[in-house]
Every structure is written in structure tokens, then in C-alpha cells.
């Protein structure tokens, strides 16, 4: 398993538009299970509504974990997405 921590910098946090794009990005990696954890609650990043229910706001620290095929590459790609969009 590979993981990284990230502090959300988007002024409105993870809202509908970036959440939808994030889910779409994660769908490219069907061989991996990608989860996001905030405040002790974890969600599969293929589940848009579960992600939205976490209520991630600017300044929150989240942990993204990747398990499965080519963890290093998938983790790096998702981390780059976070840096560019969140």
C-alpha cells in the first residue's frame, strides 16, 4: 500500500466539480483501490456521494491510500491531481 497526506488548498474544499473530476480520474485505475481518509472516516474514491459527504474543507488534511496494481504510479498520478486541482 502507498499513501500520501495532502492539505486541501482550494478555498471551497472538495466540492462537486473537483470531486466529480477526481472520481473520473480514479476510474482510470481499475486495478487499484483508492481511498481518502479525513477525520477517521474513509471512502472509496469511486463513490462520489460518499466523498461529498465527508465535507472536506480548505485546510483539512486528508490521506489518500492506494492498494493494488502499480501502486507507485497510481499514487503519484493522484497526488499530482490533488496538487493541480485541490
Roles of regions detected by a PLM:
Residues 53-86:
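C-terminal structural segments of small proteins and small subunits
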Residues 5, 33-35, 61-63:
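Residues at or immediately flanking beta-strands
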Residues 1-10:
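Short amphipathic
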